[in-house]
Each structure stands twice: as structure tokens, then as C-alpha cells.
Amino acid sequence: MIRKIAFCAGMICCGWLQAGYAQVEVELPEPAPVVYDTNYISSYRYRLTTRVYVSQKYTVFTLPTDDGNFMLFRPNNTFNQGVGWTYRGFSINLGFGLPGINGNSSQRGKSSWLDCQMHMYGRRNTIDVFLQRYQGYYIGQGKLPGYEGYYNDEAIKVRTFGGIYTHIHNWKRYSFRFGATQDEFQKRSSGSLLYGMTVLYSLVKKDDEGIAHPGIAGLARYSEVGRINTWNIGPHIGYGYNWIFLKRWYLGAAVNMAATLSLYQENKGMGSPNPEPGPYLTGTHADIAPSAIGRLAAGYNSDRWGVAFYYVHHTHLNRSYIGQYTSGSVG
């Protein structure tokens, strides 16, 4: 059975419950002088930029079923809207939940979360740091055999933390950050080789019993497994390209592939039948886990305003599945 662990990162942000979140971005210190090709990149570093945005961040996980499929668990978090500012590489966003567009929210149960992400966009290098705590998950309507409504469990918890370092080889002509921070513009199409290192820890747990309720068809194994721990570490390499057309419109994409060393453990829940203290249910296993980090950006920029869409997704493949996604639009 194959498990995926996916991680998605936005900018520096903290969110708590469904009241919204504050978001901060910091830029890596750049050695002076930093000389980039002004025929390819325009910088608005010393101008105050303001934006209005809509975004959604969520962490999901799936468990493999007895028939070889996967059962998807999602938190009940919301779309958010807010306003943000950037000046000299420092950004702050203030957001809150959007009323009226998160239908069936009460049927999906209650979720709480603390989602902190810090993204430091330097000219030559970037660093992404993650710290996420989610509690309360549901299975989609009609997805559970013999159950027509939403199945929710407010006791399931997910924890992730880690970081990604990326070096930008063609930093003089390729802007890695312009789609995310709005303080820079790619004037001509350009790309770059990207490479670096990934470290990620993830935990899925339920304190007093197995992660899956015994009544969930196809997940009998996980009615006893109360903790799933995973470490992933390894190098990544890829390519990013920004395509500029009609002078002001752009599409950007960056993909990094990796083969990480994956260490994972499964432990019985405290309330499972015949709990075994001490050793993990399956011991500690190690394998090589493929990984992918993808970023997409699209939009329009003028000298005074712009509209942008930005999406980031980070995926690891091993023996279970955890995933975080970030998507948003900026005006």
C-alpha cells in the first residue's frame, strides 16, 4: 500500500480556528551589491504595494483501504479574504473568513487549526518553513459506504513541520518570487534550474483510540493504529519558467522532483483492542520516497495594479497520505 505525504506552502502566515489569519513575509538578506538584469526584471522593492486577496489553506490525509483505494479526510476550514501590504521585502496580510460561501459547514463538523508558514524569498535562494496543527476531520458526503451524509471526527489530529531550501541558478534573469509577493515583475520570459534540500516531519494521531472508527468499511487496520509518524529528508532538483505575453500578462510554473529518505512508524492507539505498550505496531521502516514540489502563478501586472493567482503543492509518496494545499488570488 502506497501512502502519499503532500505539503503545500504559501507565504508567512498564521491562522487560528475559523476567525482568519495574519500573514507575514520576510525576504532573505541579500549580499551587496546585488546586480540583476534590468532587461528581464523590474523591482518595486522601495514602493509600498497594497493588495486585496482571497485564499484557502487546508491539510488533508488519506488512508489506504482494503480494496486498494484511498479514503480522503479533510478539515472543515474556510475561504478567507483580506488585505495586505509589502514594502522593502516585508509583507503583512490580514485575513478573515468569508461568510456565505462555505456551504454545509455545520454538517462537516468542527475543525481548529494553527497554520504558520514562513517564506523567505531572496534573489539567489528561498527558504520555506512550515508549522501546522489541525484537529477535526470529515469524509465527504456519500464517500463512506452505507453512510449518506458527512462523516466527521473531531478527535483526529495532524501535525507537520519542516523546511525547503531552494537555490535559483539563473537568478539574474529569472524572478522566483514575483508571482507570490507582488513587489517584482518579470519583464521578459526566462527560466532557471532550481535545486536544494527538503526536510519534513508529519504525524497523524488520535489520542484514545485508532485513527479510523471500527465501523468504517475497508479501514479495519486503522481502527487500531493510533499514530502514524513520518520523516522525509533528501535533495530536490527541478526547473522554473515565467512566460510573459502581451507585455503585461504572465504564466509561471516551477516543479522540483526529489527522492527522499523516508522513515515511518505506526503505533497502536491507547483504546484499541489488546494495546501493546512500547514497540510500534509495524516497527520503523525506511525506504526511498519520490517527492514533488509544484508552484503555479498567473495574472496581469501594470505599473500601478495587478491581478494574480498563486498555488503551491508539495507531495511525498510513501506508505500513507498527508497533504497540504494553498491556493489564492490577489488583486
Place the predicted regions along the sequence by residue:
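Outer-envelope beta-barrel architecture signal
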Residues: 44-50, 79, 88-90, 123-127, ...
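Residues on the lipid-exposed face of transmembrane beta-strands in outer-membrane beta-barrel proteins
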Residues: 52, 81-87, 116-120, 163-169, ...
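Outer membrane beta-barrel transmembrane domains
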Residues: 59-70, 124, 252-331
